Amino acid sequence: MTVLEVALGQYGIKEIVGKKHNPEVLKYFHEMGHDWVKDDETAWCSAFINWCAMWADKPFSDKLNARSWLDVGTEVEIPDIGDVVILWRESPGSWKGHVGLFIREAGNYIYILGGNQNNQVCIKAYPKKQLLEYRKL
């Protein structure tokens, strides 16, 4: 099974608003050894891609920071569907980022399948100008 196939199998999993937390979101942390995470409000884009890569038997960062994926796999200029996409958040120099899987480019946007996108696993468009790298696992 590919990372993309694992991720697609989770499509639609979402956070629970309020005091309850979705055990499906928490498993992305717990099955990777991050048992200290107790709520689904903790940023989980990297946990999700780590979990998918683990189940696909591919390399993973094992870290919760999206930019940790800049050290996993091989950088590619032209991505294939399912390659890892790393974006910056706030500013290119910030430690903050987002990680997901490449679906397609259209105009000035990259469509990414990922976790914690609108608080769920879904495909969402991001501005191409926020791209840091594409990575092949």
Task: Name each region found by the language model.
Residues 1-56:
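N-terminal capping segments
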